[in-house]
């Protein structure tokens, strides 16, 4: 440029005793303050490297001539200092060149002036211009006092508080130059003199660090939004290979600010915030605020975009899926037990959309929908209410006092699972009567009683408190009380005559077997049956039979006990009277069946059932003891009893297992002969007579079966089965069948058929307590045993409390030797009775013989 000119090489000798280089390049400075010295690369030597030039500038603050070595050649660059006095000097010095001899005095004088007046000092900037020249231009400075203090404090703060990577933001032109650095071209051997480098460093660091933004970034520690790239003070300088190298090496001194950052990385990361702002996020995809406002949910008639329609359809499908598990069947015991608590859980799991917007949506739907939709909704509402009515009842929370009172009245059942499983529910009789009535109405073969009473049993199970009744299932997995239909003797239903006689029946024998299978006789009777007469007969309902039977049980038993023939009564008189049955040793299911045999409703309490059975047994034994037992009765008295039975409402019937043989009023049956098997036993006829009556809905046996049921659990031996007077009236063993003579029925249970230990007593001598209660008293009254050699000897009661396995033989031996003696009991018990007692109390018991056999 035209502001400065570079003089030619001069051979001026050194002055003032200082030796300099052979070639000195004079620099002429323009007199105006805007002018700048221009250094042209006219020197034949190679230019100095940027690192060497930076070292010379930083190590010579006293304005001395620095020696620069480049490519083995020594060149001396004169350091020029432009002060305010020099810039504002007269135009005489405009074209004068500064030689090496005059450099030192001038520099010394100007240095003194600069130190004396800081306000007049200016800083020199090295700027790059397109071409191969360096421009040293002066720049007026601001007030140094305030600036110095501020920059030093900020510098200290930056070193003490900033821990991140901070770099100077460069202009796009500088970034391109930085990315592509051309090889350095030869520069002039004389470098410009720069003054006040320390102040320049502080000002550049202050402008490049950007402490305010860095502090904000440190506090937030989040990427800053994209903004205008700030320009650095050095951005005005144009590209030059030599000048560019000077700038880069000069900025290398501030490694703390440039550490970890580069211009290329900044350019690549610049467009990233734009993509993050415009791109979708997970929170924006959810958009939950539309569902919580009533205005966001529109009715089907309103126009809405397809996206909202799809979202509403998907939400409706989700609501329907939530409601489906509520309608699932109770297929497990756990689900049945927790059914009453599931109401609270379902309300907690409902969708919040339904709870918040249920009332508003209903109002909007009613106002905006047509009449046809309103009718459909009304029908849906009714169906929903009906469905909800069939659901589990709402359980109310009672006060604590009432809850404790209910606990006091609650009865606890102890025993094994098999014992509790056979318990009867409260609705047993009602179910049996309902099933029997439905079968009696039709003579066609109906479906089994299991499927007939399925709905009622399921409905009753919802309110039943017996958990064991819920364990019974049918083939479809539905809950069913199978025990009440299959195991209960009073619930046997047969609809057709052929099906009735296909049942296997058994009866007690007076011989040693106690059980006789009469399946063969039933087949012959079914073959000879007259179906026409069976259709003409009218049967009363099962409920009437039960009602009349319960009212006239004792009177009927008294009449039936008087029908014992001579041979049977004499045989019974020779035998010892049986003991009182041990009702305490029965299981809960056996006690319930005994109570049902007497005609009472099921009772939950075990103690009440035992006391009731004992009273019934005592009353029956007293009546049988007081009433006379004639050897025979005339047919007229028997006919009178039957007439009374018919007047009371009971239908006279006959059974294949009954010993009261009847004849048809229209046909006369052939007489059958009876072959005696033993002198003291009763014999069956080989030729079965034809019976014209129909099998009853429940099994009924002869009067003797009542005594079997009463004493079926006693261990004593002795039985009495009275026969009809026709057996003893003829000595040859022929049976007489009077006309219009029907039999009298008394119910029995399944225990009467399968039990082989039962005995029948005509009279009872003494009323003794049950062995079960006596065993309990003996075990509890055992005194404590002293320790033997420091080892405690627990009693039987303590062993039971500690859940130790009780050996049946040892406990029976102790009871017979000393246990019953503590309470004044003279009877003895065996291991079987002890086992029944243990099972009734839920005590763990083992057989001693089995343990010894396994050990060997």
Swiss-Prot record:
Residues 51-60 have a biased composition (Low complexity). InterPro entries: Slx4_ascomycetes, Structure-sp_endonuc_su_Slx4. Its main location: nucleus. Transmembrane segments: none annotated. GO terms for molecular function: 5'-flap endonuclease activity. GO terms for cellular component: Slx1-Slx4 complex. Belongs to the SLX4 family. Forms a heterodimer with SLX1. This is Structure-specific endonuclease subunit SLX4.
